[in-house]
Amino acid sequence: MDSVIFGGYPDPLNNANATEYNTPAIGFSWSTNVFNRSQVLASSGKIKNLYVELDAAAGTGADDTYTFTLMYDGAATSLTCAIVQGATSGNDTEHEIDVVAGKVISLRCVSSGTPSNTPNAQWSMMFSGTTANESLCVGIALCNAAAKAYAPISHGSAASTTTENNVRVICPTAGVIKNLYVILDNDPGTDPDAYCFTLRIANAANSYVLTDTALTCTIVANAVSGNDTTHSVTVAAGDWLTLSIDPKLTTPSVAPNAQYGFTFVATTDGESVLLGCSGAIGQVTTRYLSLISYIYSTLGSTTDGQSSQLAQVCTLKNLYVLLSVAPDTGAGTQSHTFTIRNNVGNSTAITTTISEAETTGNDTTNAATLAVGNNICLMVVHTNTPADSYASWGLVCYIAPVLFRSYYPHILAH
């Protein structure tokens, strides 16, 4: 099954003939620390169709170039594209990279010729899972040695919080989550120092109280990795999800960064999930948020297009939104309206309004068909100065599965 890996972040590229890295999925600020910009895969398959778009030309000099390359297991792959003088985009639709669960990927950018411009970049790739219905859900977080911390299950930066409700994401479709993989950049300290990573869920069955699931793994010093490929968790549209990071037994002497990945197995083949959350969305000024959050506390942007991520051919549908605070302030009718945007100035039909005492909303009727190079984001418009709130959301990305038909030649008897 094919699924899109969306990425992009408003951080200018380094033009000083530098090498920097970013997370292939989601995106964050460019960094020379490759671990903090790597993501661990929970499923095997192929990665292909690299597209990159800049918001300004690479430069005016003949040698001004930015070269983007998928890194796999610490080595450069053949999936690469160069954006040269005067150009604003590049792609590689020729190469396909075989990837295996438990290995890590990152996106490398190398500048050469000292480009005269330092544009922002958006990018996307395609993951083609070996197993039907499977797609990737990846993140990175910061462990907390002093207290249990929480992170979104899809996340672009090494951050976490002790306030779990701030990192909830909401599942937009039915499926199963399995194959938890975790890699630390340092071991937890001295045995028995450890961190336990657990998928948590809230749904109708548990009265929407976030509860530990059986999908969990514990990493004890001196180890730096662990996984749970045994357990799985069934999810439905509207379920809330978080990842807990628990310092076990003693207070660990080290608080490492953690890469983690899950496999999402959709009930409907062709569906993958885009999951996000934000900090306070405001009360007056329209905000634009990346569909997949680079950090749970993001405030997004007040500039249309600045929080966009790059699309490929797919269909978006099933928008679910959850607020931490209802809009009602007692003065008239207040609401927040969430709309999927496809390119600057263009709203799709996918929209939901959360009003008064409501804290949830969805649009399971409308859909939006995307093309290669579309720039997508989530717009929030406020009506009548509603109460400020954190927001969580989920959206389905659908690509029709390729159907293979066996052909048996008809053999004529002579």
Report each predicted region and the residues it spans:
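Aromatic- and Gly/Pro-enriched, solvent-exposed loop/edge beta-strand patches characteristic
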Residues: 64-131, 193-269, 334-401
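Short, cationic, amphipathic peptide segments
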Residues: 410-412
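Beta-sheet-rich sandwich/jelly-roll-like modules and their strand-loop junctions
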Residues: 1-68, 111-197, 202, 245-338, ...
